């Protein structure tokens, strides 16, 4: 995610994905790693939510996407640094809407301060503050590393979907999710509401990146033989079964 020779969220790459989306009638594209702060990953996670990296021209990306009829989906990864996010949240959401971006994915891939858990009163109050702030800015939310769904989308319909599951990403750095995992989700996790599992990986053996010198080991669970335990047909089926209005 950080800006180096492996940086993915660049203006050039963004246009490639926008072109692909337009050609395949995909309505929106999400870009992660576009903003300054990823170089602090593993530390205090001091992200700046209104300062793009030098190789990501957000004005040009949004202009190009609009020209192609594609929505840009925003991204706020907090790393669990709640005080840092809350200081910037209102301004950052307004900044997005000023750029014509009205859908936002949030992330909390890290520990909350002072040992607070995601489901603590501190965490629940924060998540509610995000939903209400987004509503004021007429933004739709997709929360990753969220608290469990309790039906608040009936009151706050901008809370469109959330992760809250061992999702697709686990296949990239571990033994992966077993085939039985997807069979259980509709009868367990999905009882509470929409599930943003992020299905749709067609390179199930990671052949495009497996031997790339640019590939980087993520953690100790990555043994170098990660793959998606699925078939192409199942990936298509997951889009239908694992409901997420995003």
Task: Give each language-model segment a name.
Residues 32-222:
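Aromatic- and carboxylate-enriched substrate-binding clefts and catalytic-loop regions
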Residues 212-246:
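Glycine-rich, aromatic-lined ligand/substrate-binding cores of catalytic
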């Amino acid at each position: 995610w950080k800006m180096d020779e492996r940086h993915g969220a660049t203006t050039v790459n963004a246009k490639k994905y926008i072109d692909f989306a337009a050609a395949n009638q995909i309505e929106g594209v999400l870009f992660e790693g576009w903003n300054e702060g990823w170089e602090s990953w593993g530390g205090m996670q001091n992200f700046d939510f209104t300062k793009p990296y030098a190789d990501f021209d957000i004005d040009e990306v949004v202009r190009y996407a609009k020209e192609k009829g594609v929505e840009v989906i925003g991204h706020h990864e907090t790393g669990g640094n709640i005080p840092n996010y809350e200081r910037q949240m209102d301004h950052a959401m307004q900044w997005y809407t000023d750029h014509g971006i009205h859908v936002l994915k949030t992330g909390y891939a890290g520990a909350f301060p002072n040992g607070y858990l995601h489901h603590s009163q501190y965490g629940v109050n924060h998540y509610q503050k995000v939903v209400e702030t987004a509503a004021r800015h007429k933004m739709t939310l997709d929360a990753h590393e969220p608290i469990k769904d309790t039906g608040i989308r009936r009151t706050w319909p901008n809370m469109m979907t959330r992760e809250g599951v061992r999702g697709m990403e686990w296949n990239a750095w571990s033994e992966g999710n077993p085939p039985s995992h997807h069979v259980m989700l509709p009868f367990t996790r999905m009882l509470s509401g929409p599930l943003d599992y992020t299905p749709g990986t067609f390179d199930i053996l990671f052949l495009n990146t497996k031997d790339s010198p640019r590939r980087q080991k993520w953690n100790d669970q990555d043994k170098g033989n990660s793959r998606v335990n699925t078939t192409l047909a199942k990936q298509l089926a997951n889009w239908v079964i694992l409901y997420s209005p995003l």
